[in-house]
């Protein structure tokens, strides 16, 4: 049985998804499985036929135009796989095609988990933030640091809009507690109104149930590209500042008129 299951989501970004997949193949910890769900464009072109590693399964999302227009498709894909019964790992990680794991990511999460007697149900690591320039090079422009335990369960640090999905790792078993507590098997919200922080909602709900343990080591890079949906990032300091202010203002308006979903 694999130690770790990773869900990879692909939405027609051939260069970036290849780099994302390579970051999984390059892990120092070898006992993992991955399921790559592609929106269909690359899958139909047989783009992934080069992958021969039996640990990676590639499948189309099967999404319809109506679903793509009305739902958060990344969340929909996550939920579909989490409810499929096909994931066998004790720990679960998520990866979208903009982003990459550093080589020791899986080993670091797994070693922390085992060294703590397999008791932690959720962990988060530190992360680099990068901007991809027109030539394809990634410039590191900031970091998110895992400084202390997080989640309301331990009266810890906030997760929503502070921690990125790529920093987060949870056990498979915590999902049973999630279903019991929230009376749903829709773990990741599919509501498009929450698209700017759907991952944050999920992490906060997990953080209500268990301590989210910090791992200070930088294990991933969240890359902002021309196609990134989470923030219109720029390569200049002024551009980044304006984009951040815009995102915070939008979040403040949404919080004012809609109650927190966690």
Label the model's feature ranges:
Residues 1-262:
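Nucleotide-sugar donor-binding/catalytic module of glycosyltransferases
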